[in-house]
Each structure stands twice: as C-alpha cells, then as structure tokens.
Amino acid sequence: MDTFGLKIIASDRVFYEGRCRKLVIPAPDGEKGILPNHENMVIAVKIGMARMEIEEGNWVEVALGRGFAEVVNNRVTLLVDTAEKPE
C-alpha cells in the first residue's frame, strides 16, 4: 500500500517524522481520516487521540493538543500545542 509523509510538530519538539499508511485525527466536527494521495486541505485539530498506521496492522496512538493539520502533495504536517504518547 502507498504511504505519505507525516510530520507531527509540538510547540517544544518534532514528535514524529516519517512515513504513514493511514492517519485519523480529532477535529471539531468529528474524526478525520487521511490516506495516501488525499486532496490538499487544512483541518483544525482539537484535543484528543490521533491514530496512525505506520506499518500494516501496526497502529500507534498519540495524545494531541489543539492545532491544525495541513495536507499538501502527499505530505501531512500537524502543528499542535502538545503531542505525547499515552500512558
């Protein structure tokens, strides 16, 4: 399956930078799913849990603060207040 570039930037560090197969992020109007070759867009991100599939069947959860996601040219950049691994 195709992948896309994903970069998660918190206010204090780059949390993740690499390839991703699927991404689900919390948005004010519900969860948004992003797949490879998604159309370009900007999405508001609300506080909540994001899920990303790095390898087939290997899902990773990330606790996100407020921010936004930019989807452009098969790359997704998440700019958020905080990004943490859930405990």
Predicted regions and their residues:
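Compact, glycine-rich, soluble single-domain proteins
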Residues: 5-87
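Intrinsically disordered, compositionally biased charged tails
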Residues: 1-3
